[in-house]
A protein has these predicted regions:
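Catalytic-loop motifs flanking and including active-site residues across diverse enzymes
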Residues: 14-17, 80-81, 144, 148-152, ...
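Catalytic cores of carbohydrate-active enzymes
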Residues: 7, 17-121, 125-127, 170, ...
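Active-site lining segments of carbohydrate-active enzymes
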Residues: 1-9
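C-terminal substrate/ligand-recognition segments
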Residues: 119-164, 213-217
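Long alpha-helical scaffolds in large eukaryotic adaptor/regulatory proteins
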Residues: 25, 29-36, 156-159, 163, ...
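Feature representing long, continuous alpha-helical segments
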Residues: 98, 102, 146-154, 166, ...
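Terminal, non-catalytic domain-edge segments
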Residues: 206-225
Length: 225
């Protein structure tokens, strides 16, 4: 078969996860006196990974490329770059994180989640309707995903701290009505990427519910700081 959304080579969120894992294990080992040498080695690898990450993915417009495969650069603005600004360990500095978050705010954010691709990108298809094949081609090409917004809002809170609380709270309001429209107390799988942002797919999606609960916990944490 053919992939609906082909992505090959160096993929931005895979490399973000790799850096995060290297740093996490390095700090974990640093607490063990007998593993300090391995901890230092992993920290060194992470440092090289961070430099390579920035050289590979950060473009002159201030956001991250989705993937790089040899000479093929995918300039699509996708939410996959947000993980690099939301994880505990990031290969980006504060200015670089802000660039990705600002792009996501302008191009991807909706009242019902984060779009899977920017409307200005080729192949944008915001409506999850029609037969299976048609819906498959819309799945990651413009529909909005609440679970991805959880990572976006976490990145926003990391950047702006307490000053971000009111913004995050306003984003959460968009889900209140949805909890009584489809499955009581739950959020549907995804939403159309354009107004009126109609809920689609499964009537209850655990990843979305979990991210909303996690975001509410993050709000409480920052509110108490």
């Amino acid at each position: 078969g053919r992939p609906v959304t082909p992505r090959s080579g160096d993929i931005v969120e895979f490399n973000t996860l790799w850096y995060n894992a290297l740093m996490y294990v390095s700090e974990l080992l640093a607490e063990n006196e007998g593993a300090s040498e391995l901890s230092s080695r992993l920290a060194g690898i992470a440092e090289k990974t961070a430099k390579s990450f920035v050289d590979t993915f950060l473009n002159e417009y201030g956001y991250l490329l989705d993937y790089v495969d040899g000479d093929m650069l995918d300039w699509s603005v996708r939410p996959n770059m947000i993980f690099a600004a939301s994880f505990d360990y990031s290969p980006l500095d504060a200015k670089q994180k802000k660039g990705s978050v600002d792009f996501a705010t302008r191009e991807l954010l909706t009242p019902k989640g984060v779009r899977s691709v920017c409307p200005k990108s080729g192949g944008y298809n915001p409506n999850y309707v029609g037969p299976q094949l048609q819906r498959d081609y819309a799945y990651h090409q413009g529909t909005a995903w609440p679970w991805l917004e959880g990572f976006y809002l976490e990145a926003y809170l990391r950047l702006y701290k307490r000053s971000a609380i009111s913004f995050v709270e306003r984003q959460m309001i968009g889900y209140e009505d949805e909890m009584s429209l489809h499955c009581l107390g739950a959020i549907p799988e995804l939403f159309d990427g354009n107004p009126p942002f109609k809920g689609r797919g499964a009537v209850s999606f655990a990843m979305n519910v979990a991210q909303i609960l996690r975001t509410l916990n993050l709000l409480e944490k920052y509110d108490n700081q």
